[in-house]
Amino acid sequence: MRTPRLVTAVLTAVPLIVAIPAATAGATAAAADSAPVAAAPQIPPPVHHGTLRIAGRPRDGALVTASGVAWHAPRLPRGMKLLSFEVAYTWQSCAPSGRRCTTAAGSTATPFAARQFRAGHADTGRRLRVTETAAEVVQTKARNFTFKVLRRSVSRLASVPVRAYRRHQRPVSYFRNGTPERHTASAEEYFGVSSPHYNSADGQPSQRYRVDQGAWRPMPANHVFYTGKLAVGPHQVSVRTANRAGSTQIQFGWRVVPLPAPLACQPRAGQPCWYPPHLAANHKPMRWDWQIGLTTPLKRTGKRAVDMYDIDGFLTTRAEVAAIQTRWPASTLAHPKTICYLDLAWEDYRPDASPPGRGGLFPAATLGNVYFGYPEERWVDFRQLDALKPMLRERIGMCARKGFSAVELDDIDSFDPPSTTGFRLTPGDAQNYLAYAFNLIHADGMTGLWKNSPLLSWWGRKYSDGAVLEECYTYHQCTAAQLRGSSQYGITCTGLSGATPCGWDDFTTDKTAAQPNGKWVGDAEYGDDHFVCNPGQTGAKCKGQHSYAAFCRALYDPPLGFAAVKFDVDLDGRVFYPCPRGA
């Protein structure tokens, strides 16, 4: 389960404006529909000039461009702040009548991306339609410190007929779904290739590929091929497309470089790095609280003092971080430490969401599919590390400037299937990206916490200093023994003594000079899944659920010693049941 976060209504086009409070973080679409809806002030729509048209020669294989409209954000009333302004393009293939439209093959449909589109063979004789949508994301703030995120968009349409590929012209193909950067530490890659562009009278083309100087192989039916494991050094892939009209060949070359070694945490301004220990001074798991779905100020845990607060890096101010670390009560420390929560995904309500040139840090080509259930978020192409380094440096640097002790990186499992992410990424792509991110955290004087992603945890342990888990108890994925035999993406989990121990006891037993009793692991279970009862609940209220005492015995008690807590999925400070009961 993914970390709960901000969910708001998407305001489309015209006068209807609805906002859901930010505290609905993590809710499903159904839950969002049933959430209390607050009346929102009217926000002016995006401003545009000109008429949308499709420029270029619309035929099979041709690159066309949506153009003719200039957009800009409107002047906003006082009390409103523009968070991001985006222009998105969706391409559709329609019947000659202009009806019965479906998303065109190869349409990326990413925010402020896909302004250009290459018509395909399947579009011949049909109409190509583009929808250009400008959307603004605006924040309002009230006197009680609550805030709402509002969205409003305006769309324009244009369409053209698509002509056939020229007769007797050699067929062509193109790389799609992106390619790795020219230098990467990933030793394996997937390459997507477009269906051939050709004239039917010249015959159905064949496609073949090869890696380096290897044998030519038939292209798989899904037009995606895998390089296999590659050695450090230069590499090249080639694709050949041929029919009676002739043949063409495309190539892509890049260099695999060694993965950077883990960097030790560098003291900042004379202050030593803080490493979260497996067990605190009282020989028990170090207690923590997690508040990132905030619409109100941070809540102290009062008598249930904790040693660590995991809080939103953007929403929390430097003054709040200082107050927590110098004045708030703690459990075993003088004062609590603070963890800076950062999402590695694109979130449209963050101040860096706009593309470069508009005050943001996410190039259009790096954005993929929408997160399921989280329409305000997009997957990010981890292959494009150099393009995303400015974003990582700024976000992690923000945590350091605010005085955080550690950083939690969320959404690191970017090698999910392409149907989920929009990219064909490998575990090696994730390792290349995350090695840079965690080393950057250490270079800025903070420690780093791994998040979920058990298939890579055995590797991530070398670069990180602890872990945050979600519902490992619910899904029976806490220990190396529970995960043993799990296999995906070429990774097979072994037991704790094997080469790839995917369990989190691999962290707690990892004893280093900085963490002599192992690395801290915190687990969050959520009440909305009805898997663990609340403390003191019995009978009908707990029918079919595990008791709170059993949950604590399994995770908090030896030998695991996880800092186990039951939260509400909103993570807004209202629900906090740490193990053991009464703590």
Regions found by a protein language model. Name each.
Residues 80-85, 202-203, 331-335:
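Short helix-terminating capping/connector loops at secondary-structure junctions
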Residues 2, 31-32:
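Short Cys/His-based metal-binding microdomains
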Residues 1-14:
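N-terminal export and membrane-targeting signals
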Residues 8, 17-18, 24-30, 184, ...:
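Compositionally biased low-complexity segments, especially N-terminal hydrophobic helices
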Residues 161-263:
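Low-complexity, disordered linker/stalk regions enriched in Pro/Thr/Ser/Gly
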Residues 235, 258-583:
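Glycan-processing catalytic domains of CAZymes
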